[in-house]
Amino acid sequence: MESKSEQNEWSSGVWAHLTAVRQQSPLVQCITNFVSMDLVANTLLSAGASPAMVHSVVEIPDFTPHIHALCVNVGTLTPDWLPSMKAAAELASQLRKPWVLDPAAVSCSGFRLKACLELIELKPTVIKGNGSEIIALSSASRGQTKGADSSHESTDAIEAAKSLAMSSGAVVAVSGAVDIVTDGKQVIGVHNGTKMMQQITATGCSLAGLIVAFLAIDSSRVLEATVSAMAVFGIAGELGEAMANGPASLRMHLIDCLYGLDETTVLKRVNVTRLG
Amino acid sequence: MESKSEQNEWSSGVWAHLTAVRQQSPLVQCITNFVSMDLVANTLLSAGASPAMVHSVVEIPDFTPHIHALCVNVGTLTPDWLPSMKAAAELASQLRKPWVLDPAAVSCSGFRLKACLELIELKPTVIKGNGSEIIALSSASRGQTKGADSSHESTDAIEAAKSLAMSSGAVVAVSGAVDIVTDGKQVIGVHNGTKMMQQITATGCSLAGLIVAFLAIDSSRVLEATVSAMAVFGIAGELGEAMANGPASLRMHLIDCLYGLDETTVLKRVNVTRLG
Amino acid sequence: MESKSEQNEWSSGVWAHLTAVRQQSPLVQCITNFVSMDLVANTLLSAGASPAMVHSVVEIPDFTPHIHALCVNVGTLTPDWLPSMKAAAELASQLRKPWVLDPAAVSCSGFRLKACLELIELKPTVIKGNGSEIIALSSASRGQTKGADSSHESTDAIEAAKSLAMSSGAVVAVSGAVDIVTDGKQVIGVHNGTKMMQQITATGCSLAGLIVAFLAIDSSRVLEATVSAMAVFGIAGELGEAMANGPASLRMHLIDCLYGLDETTVLKRVNVTRLG
């Protein structure tokens, strides 16, 4: 059982992170998919960050040096977008800016899997996926070709996440009924969030964007910043669902709640535990 | 006048189709336009289907064999997207997976009209458009070049729809004040829906996506599955409008209502008639 | 102090413009960024206009001659989109159709700044940006390379806007706490709107789209039509914020309010002053 003081520590850390995002309004570059651009941008704005959906390879040398952190999401990947993603990721890594890889639907093609493995070579700070995506990536990173099974629950993905974290050097975040965050040694569970959030497209991408904003303001504590972002997004979803009649109103209330989230609510609702 | 037993048959068919979509959660690949990706995905999710917005030509050989059905929408067509659409459509036809063509704004250019005619050669299961689009396609299929007049009501388009259905082998669905579905012989009218739905961008595209999901779970009864999808979408719009203050809240309530639609409401509200 | 009769003149002008948009439903072509396509289209629909998100360079010769006005927004510019923007802008100028340039994030790269300067050569009717964007463009138009500082308030941008208007021949609109519209001589302030609108992505792009619709129905009075569009959008935002719990519900209510805006409300709320 989690000690009360440790739970309090997580809670106050989450609130400190959210406050810092609101105060510093980090500039977050997103190279994300077409489906999620709108919701990712609105998620970041409602959290207090400054999103910039800049994806042209010709703009990266000028723009990426000015950002605080980067999000790369392969959800609607085509070959012409990959050079931009690589250029931005490489530059971010060189300049020691944190960046997150969201390997959305990584198993849908050999092309996409290969692209994600190449992006992992560029040293993402965090890899954020669902259970199936993390299992597929972890297997492929070990040279295995077993396909992903989308029925994997995130808790089943713990070993895959730890393995991927060890081999890649990234913190790995797995969204699911219980969100998992691991650096390969520690395993943290985030129990916030609701099932209906999965009925809204682009919530996973938006969570990845939010993690980027939190990394931007605490890049030395990657595991903790990632946990904080997942807890904040989950709490906004819980509050939103209490007001919602279905997924579309949940989507609206989630963003409103993220915007209005206050200290009392955060401290009361953060539900984070050590799983290993 | 429609017999009561025939109306009951349509109603119970609509409910059976919706239930099957929810239970089977078919995987629906959408190659659609930039404007509609978000709403199409959320419409499919709220109906219980699994949308996948995969459009890269390099991913189609790996991915399309795993889908249950395909949606192709030319709303923001550029020459570089057409090969993907053709490759996916051709593969879907080969593998006997149903696919829907939405010839959005087909008359806006010679390029787009030609592209749609080429796609029709690949044997769509259903062609879904508004009256103007269907009239333009039907004329062009007969070698006529008369431009479309956007003032055509869907009921005026019946003859064009029948002709296009006969020449293409597709079931043709025409959205409008009364939705029309025809296989070239039978003509069915779907009287559900509200006028304000036309004030929301991408509702037509979302309806096309929904038809795909319904075809996925009953591909042997194309006419009936198409009617069911149109009735369900229309009913969700009616329920949504009763709660809405304008098009943006209608959009939200429509998705929520689609998600929550129950048997009693479906059986009571389905309004389908034989027109010929 | 503004005379009451002058204020009344602005108010009745705004209402006359909105009424004309609703009655004439102008066809507005938008070549805009991926993030904003959905909201721009819904803004135009809710105002009574007909949006068409047609951006392929191969479609412009067929399509652009039929439009009433054009919107060009560089928010997610890549080199392959620029020829379309130029072709459409050039054709619009040739055919004396009004067009608006939204130089979104113009300072994010040398490529984007150069593209905007080239587009300005094609004689936009209106250039709409925030203070930083207008200052950056104005400096660059004078051959200066000083970067934009995003902390500039729109009122600080008056001189830059006047200078850009004089050099380009366009009316320049600057969104901010007080919106500014100038033809280089007259300077008009629009005091409608709320701060929270900046927490929603694509509101600036949507305002640009709305200006296009208003130009379409009164192309001979560019300054006045631009002021009207900004006042209408601002009023919709004020009404929306009164009903909102955060940015996502504001976004919904804004569109609903734009759709339902009536004469009494417009006449009462328009807040326009001469600043110079």
UniProtKB/Swiss-Prot annotation, chains A, B, C:
Pfam families noted in UniProt: HK
Mutant lacking the gene: phenotype: No visible phenotype.
Superkingdom classification of source: Eukaryota
Binding site for substrate: 53, 202
Transit peptide keyword on record: no
Inducing stimuli: Not regulated by thiamine or 4-methyl-5-(2-phosphonooxyethyl)thiazole.
Cofactors demanded by this protein: Mg(2+)
EC number: 2.7.1.50
Reactions catalysed according to its record: 5-(2-hydroxyethyl)-4-methylthiazole + ATP = 4-methyl-5-(2-phosphooxyethyl)-thiazole + ADP + H(+)
GO molecular function annotation: ATP binding; hydroxyethylthiazole kinase activity; magnesium ion binding
Keyword vocabulary terms for this entry: ATP-binding, Kinase, Magnesium, Metal-binding, Nucleotide-binding, Thiamine biosynthesis, Transferase
GO biological process, one term: thiamine diphosphate biosynthetic process
Physiological role: Thiazole kinase involved in thiamine salvage pathway.
Membership in a protein family: Belongs to the Thz kinase family.
NCBIfam families: PRK09355.1
Name of the molecule in the record: Hydroxyethylthiazole kinase
Organism (species): Arabidopsis thaliana (Mouse-ear cress)
Gene it is expressed from: THIM
